[in-house]
Amino acid sequence: MSENKITYIENAVLGEGYYSIEHKSGLRIFVYPKEEYTSTYAVFGTKYGSIDTRFKRSDRADFIEIPAGTAHFLEHKLFESEELDAFQRYAKTGASTSFDRTCYLFMCTGNFKENFEILIDFVRHPYFTEETVRKEQGIIGQEIDMYKDSPEWECLFNMLSAMYHKHPVRIDIAGTKQSISEIT
């Protein structure tokens, strides 16, 4: 695709619509204009979640296996850089990981372009050191312990584990303490 393809999709019932943009790189972008809002939100979502633990590259014959919890680990780490922690700079940032998606978001009332460029930069240029990886492993380990205090969460993953003996959906989105310790 040499040019961006822009389509406006309108919902007659709601009386509003959005733009669907197919960027020449293949990235899909959705813009929902809301003139009455004073805040602007941006979400960068990718089709990469907790079940994506096995990959095959086009230049290799074998599969690459990564530890359970890697998508969630990256969700935590991608808001950091050597110079900047996005959570310290912006009041409203967030991220989430599901079985098949990871999303990064921010809200601002000004400087949208600068904020958006920073979000894209965090995703495109991750920052890792041995120290920050170890620190995050500890934080996620505590998060895993916290999930164990939730009967609903434990029930869900006990059920998934009983239903799916081999599929990665049976493993907690955050991984296990063992699997996150394998992330280097």
Regions picked out by a protein language model, each given a short descriptive name:
Residues K77, E82-T184:
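Acidic/histidine-enriched segments that form metal/cofactor-coordinating
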Residues M1-D85:
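His/Glu-rich zincin catalytic helix
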